[in-house]
């Protein structure tokens, strides 16, 4: 699909990429559709991306793609089905970057991190200083969002497995941006983890996008 990064008239050459292609093996069902505050987990991630200064947004789907696309409000994001999703997160990342190849940079988030703050996205964008990648950290631990500059795209399209992209980042200049005060770095991999997020109260920060 040849769609400009600034699609929709957005003023940013930065694209948004939400990875949501996993099979939810540990969860036991399509966790992208599990509800938090009455909204599917994936929709929280998409709403958050839409509140940031970003142009085109792509969401990568794989397992259960048709059902997910029919039940989740994508908030203007373009769905891309990655045929290689079973090869791991790196394959999904490669599929998404191929769709956003004309962007000067791409901000990556995950579809199972509903509490990632829009301010975390703004913070990593504001931190651009020539580093190949900029990522949020929580209590010193690397997390998302991660901003990838265009110079990394080609190399990232060649990595494999769930750890491939992380290993590549070990070899380039990465700027870590502390986001401890914003919270939201938790993945939802199990039903117990979802219950724990529910117990913390409503998700805040990402206003609904009309």
Give the residues covered by each predicted segment.
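Conserved nucleotide-sugar donor-binding
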Residues: 143-154, 191
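Conserved alpha/beta core of the MobA/IspD/sugar-nucleotide pyrophosphorylase nucleotidyltransferase superfamily
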Residues: 1-12, 154, 158-210
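A residue-level structural signature of the nucleotidyltransferase/glycosyltransferase Rossmann-like core
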Residues: 113, 144-147, 157, 185-186
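Nucleotide and nucleotide-moiety/phosphate-recognizing core
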Residues: 8-142, 150, 171-180
């Amino acid at each position: 699909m040849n769609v400009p990064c600034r699609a929709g008239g957005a003023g940013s050459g930065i694209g948004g990429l939400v990875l949501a292609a996993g099979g939810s093996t540990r969860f036991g069902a399509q966790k992208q559709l599990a509800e938090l505050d009455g909204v599917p987990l994936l929709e929280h991630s998409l709403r958050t991306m839409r509140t940031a200064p970003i142009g085109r947004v792509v969401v990568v789907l794989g397992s259960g793609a048709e059902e997910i696309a029919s039940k989740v409000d994508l908030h203007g994001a373009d769905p891309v089905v990655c045929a290689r999703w079973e090869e791991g997160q790196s394959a999904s990342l490669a599929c998404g970057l191929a769709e956003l190849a004309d962007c000067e940079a791409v901000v990556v988030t995950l579809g199972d991190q509903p509490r990632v703050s829009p301010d975390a996205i703004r913070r990593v964008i504001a931190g651009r200083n020539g580093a190949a990648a900029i990522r949020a950290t929580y209590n010193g631990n690397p997390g998302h969002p991660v901003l990838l500059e265009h110079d990394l795209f080609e190399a990232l399209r060649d990595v494999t497995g769930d750890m491939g992209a992380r290993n590549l980042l070990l070899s380039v200049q990465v700027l870590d941006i502390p986001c401890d005060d914003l919270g939201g770095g938790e993945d939802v991999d199990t039903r117990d983890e979802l219950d724990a997020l529910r117990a913390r109260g409503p998700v805040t920060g990402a206003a609904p996008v009309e």
